[in-house]
UniProtKB/Swiss-Prot annotation:
This is 5-methyltetrahydropteroyltriglutamate--homocysteine methyltransferase. L-homocysteine binds at residues 445-447, 498, 613. Pathway: Amino-acid biosynthesis; L-methionine biosynthesis via de novo pathway; L-methionine from L-homocysteine (MetE route): step 1/1. The gene is metE. Catalyzes the transfer of a methyl group from 5-methyltetrahydrofolate to homocysteine resulting in methionine formation. One of its GO terms (molecular function) is 5-methyltetrahydropteroyltriglutamate-homocysteine S-methyltransferase activity. Keywords: Amino-acid biosynthesis, Metal-binding, Methionine biosynthesis, Methyltransferase, Repeat, Transferase, Zinc. SUPFAM superfamilies: UROD/MetE-like. Its cofactor is Zn(2+). Belongs to the vitamin-B12 independent methionine synthase family. Its EC number is 2.1.1.14. GO terms for biological process: methionine biosynthetic process; methylation.
Length: 766
């Protein structure tokens, strides 16, 4: 019999119960007993809802108080020395150790006077919008079983009568995700010390009556060096003698050159992602022995659309012919990346809601597909397949999805639409003459502090308690304050502060046709931080101007230059749930045309500088380098399409906030923004090496202070950083600005830091 299973399930709860409990605990409003009770209730509810959906083998170990990689670090005893005082008397970690590692802690390792030990680094989980805590390894790293959570949860699930499959991050993926600290060394040197602890974990699980364990090894979808491939063989040969059956789970891409390795590992089963890489199925069917289990991920774990059951079933039937009862059905990856339950959405348009599926509904789709293999004539199977066909046809034919005007406009785009009228060298001369800015011009990235007054006004307006006129007055008051502060500080190019914006994507998405919004479509970003991405369901267009009135008002308050502030097409796309029926490239082009219209309206309103933020530009890179150039080509083209309609004298800025430029510097240059502002202060300007080596041709504003900290930098520090930048970039092409927007900071530290920043620029002009 084919079997239905999940690789993982969301942990936050349908009403974000985990987020609320965590934040209450951190504030001291909930004790640890209460927090643990919430976790236990969520786990029980999630196991039950999956079981009721028809999932036969339930994941255990997918629950985490903050992040699954952090939980695994505690399990293996990988706890940086600076957090040792947060452990118990026996030297073992506690829940507070876990939170200290995630959030930082005071008075660790002999620190006194409230000094905070910094948290572990947070970074993206492969190419998703989830973030994990990066393990820190030392050359003398020791591993020991130190955290009982997994075993306790297996007991919990067994007590409730569930058949479970514990989920572990595989040893090679775990080492790959970590960073070497202190002396440089090869992380693979740690493998032989790590494997005995995995063996101990497997022994404990076997003693609990577990039959199958899932090893998540998504690094098998990456470009792996040969020594890592060899290490895979060594690791799994070492673990093959444990009494448990092992399923190696790969996802987020195809196995490609790692297929031979994955197919011959001494394990009992292999999971592959057929959503991201459907083309790999024939090769896997050819290479994987039929006595092993093949788990096919046919339901998309990373998006919100209902599965095309007919299409998925065709692939499953092809595999079923060879693997028979050794075929398992699953999501493409953990459902962690999907919202929890569509049934909570009681205000969605019924037609649009019918096209969607969240984690609970995806679990049901997985079960139906498994049932279809085992009993194709069953009534529920026949009905589900018929309904799926109707829904897919409805969506494919809907006039709400397809807009002929948008499609015609896109078809009429020419190469000239992607080109500024003149080269940068000519444009910058005209712009400098028009703007008349001093050397080392000062500006900020866009947002100013979002105070409680701003948030309360926005909330009251959304709830209908504050009229549009009163809300507009409240936001204009905030804009006046932001402009006055900037003028008093002596900044050269001003911003309006973005008081009216709740989020840099959602604000624009709410004003574009082709987007829909949920009330409960939350997914975890990390810890207690959840995001509710907008959903692109149809062709995208801008019915009317989105920012012009606000920016025009701000410009009316000052004689200084006011920047228009927009979010770029790639970032809009990457931070939304996108369509599956058209390519990301097409969606980016549609967004680019909508933003182009806004840019031109701002120009017509007399705005001399327009900033188009592309914070997610690098995040869109595929996991395999061979696929990078195709992405970079269309991402650059989308930016150029939205930015290239303006006259030479209108200056286009872009902002990027990430820490690696070397491998994409040519593409960043190809965007042809007149000015790029970037995050560099934490790297002590080392990131500018990429711009120096490549001889980046346009203006640059390297961030001179870190906005993620409340610390106010001294003027001398910023002078030093700008001087360092000037050794790499000609001084006449340098701008002076913070690393990122100031939305999360308070006004006192913001003003203090900007006073020093302006002073630094003035000092350099002498």
């Amino acid at each position: 019999m084919a079997l239905a299973h999940n690789l993982g399930f969301p942990r936050i709860g349908a009403d974000r119960e985990l987020k609320k409990a965590l934040e209450a605990y951190w504030k001291g409003d909930l004790d640890q007993t209460g927090l643990r009770a919430v976790g236990q209730q969520l786990r029980a509810a999630h196991w039950q809802v999956q079981k009721e959906a028809g999932i036969e083998l339930l994941p255990v170990g997918d629950f985490a108080w903050y992040d699954q990689v952090l939980t695994h670090s505690l399990t293996l005893g990988v706890i940086p020395e600076r957090f040792s005082p947060a452990q118990d008397a026996a030297g073992l970690p506690t829940l507070d150790t876990l939170f200290a590692m995630a959030r930082g802690a005071s008075n660790c390792c002999g620190a006194s006077h409230g000094k905070t030990q910094h948290a572990q680094e947070l970074t993206k989980w492969f190419d998703t919008n989830y973030h994990y805590l990066v393990p820190e390894f030392t050359q003398d790293q020791r591993f020991q079983l130190s955290w009982e959570q997994l075993f306790e949860e297996v007991d919990e699930a067994h007590a409730l009568g569930h058949k479970v499959k514990p989920v572990l991050i595989g040893p090679l993926t775990y080492l790959w995700l970590g960073k070497a600290k202190g002396d440089s060394f090869d992380r693979l040197e740690l493998l032989d010390r790590l494997l005995p602890v995995y063996g101990e974990i497997l022994g404990r699980l076997a003693a609990q009556g577990v039959e199958w364990v899932q090893f998540d090894e998504p690094v098998l979808t990456l470009d792996l060096p040969q020594d890592w491939k060899t290490a895979f063989e060594r690791a799994y040969h070492s673990l093959q003698y444990s009494p448990l059956k092992k399923l190696v789970a790969t996802y987020f891409g195809g196995l490609e050159d790692n297929l031979g390795l994955a197919a011959t590992l001494p394990v009992d089963g292999l999971h592959i992602d057929l959503v991201r890489a459907p083309e790999q199925l024939p090769a896997v069917l050819d290479r994987l022995p039929s006595y092993k289990v093949l788990s096919l991920g046919v339901v998309n774990g990373r998006n919100v659309w209902r599965c095309d059951l007919d299409n998925a079933l065709a692939a499953l039937q092809q595999a079923h012919a060879r693997f028979g009862d050794n075929l398992w059905v699953a999501g493409s990856c953990s459902l962690l990346h999907s919202p929890v339950d569509l049934n909570r959405e009681d205000r969605l348009d019924p037609e649009l809601k019918g096209w969607l599926a969240f984690a609970v509904q995806k679990s049901r789709e997985i079960a139906i597909l498994s049932h279809a293999l085992n009993d194709p004539e069953a009534t529920e199977v026949v009905e589900a397949l018929a309904q799926s066909c109707e829904i897919q046809a409805s969506r494919a034919q809907s006039s709400r999805v397809h807009n002929p005007q948008v499609q015609a406009r896109l078809a009429s785009v020419t190469a000239a639409d992607h080109q500024r009228r003149s080269a940068f060298a000519e444009r910058i001369t005209v712009q400098r003459e028009r703007l008349k800015l001093p050397a080392f011009p000062t500006t900020t990235i866009g947002s100013f502090p979002q105070t409680s007054a701003i948030r309360l006004a926005r909330q009251a307006h959304k709830q209908g308690k504050l009229s549009l006129n009163d809300y507009t007055d409240a936001m204009r008051h905030e804009i006046r304050h932001a402009v006055q502060v900037q003028e008093n500080l002596g900044l050269d190019v001003l911003v309006h502060g973005e008081a009216e914006r709740n989020d840099m994507v959602e604000y624009f998405a709410e004003q574009l046709d082709g987007y829909l919004f949920t009330r409960f479509g939350w997914v975890q970003s990390y810890g207690s931080r959840c995001v509710k991405p907008a959903i692109i369901f149809g062709d995208l267009s801008r019915p009317q101007p989105m920012t012009v009135d606000w920016i025009r008002y701000a410009q009316s308050l000052t004689d200084k230059t006011m920047k228009g502030m927009l979010t770029g097409p790639v970032t809009m796309l990457m931070w939304s749930f996108s369509r599956e029926d058209v390519s990301r490239q097409v969606q980016a082009q549609q967004l680019a045309l909508a933003i182009r219209d806004e840019v031109l309206d701002l120009e017509r309103a007399g705005i001399k500088i327009v900033q188009i933020d592309e914070a997610a530009f690098r995040e869109g890179l595929p996991l395999r380098k061979a696929q990078w150039q195709q992405y970079l080509d269309w991402a650059v083209a989308a930016f150029r399409l939205c930015a290239s309609g303006v006259r030479d004298e209108t200056q286009i800025h872009t902002h990027m906030c990430y820490s690696e430029f070397n491998d994409v510097i040519k593409s960043i240059a190809a965007m042809d923004a007149d000015v790029i502002t970037i995050e560099t202060s934490r790297s002590d300007m080392e990131l500018l090496d990429a711009f120096e080596a490549f001889d980046y041709p346009n203006d640059i504003g390297p961030g001179v202070y870190d906005i993620h900290s409340p610390r106010v930098p001294e003027t001398a520090e910023m002078v030093s950083l700008i001087a360092k930048a000037a050794r790499r970039i000609p001084a006449e092409r340098l701008w002076v600005n913070p690393d990122c927007g100031l939305k999360t900071r308070g006004w006192p530290e913001t003003e203090a830091a900007l006073i020093n920043m302006v002073a630094a620029a003035r000092q350099l002009r002498l």
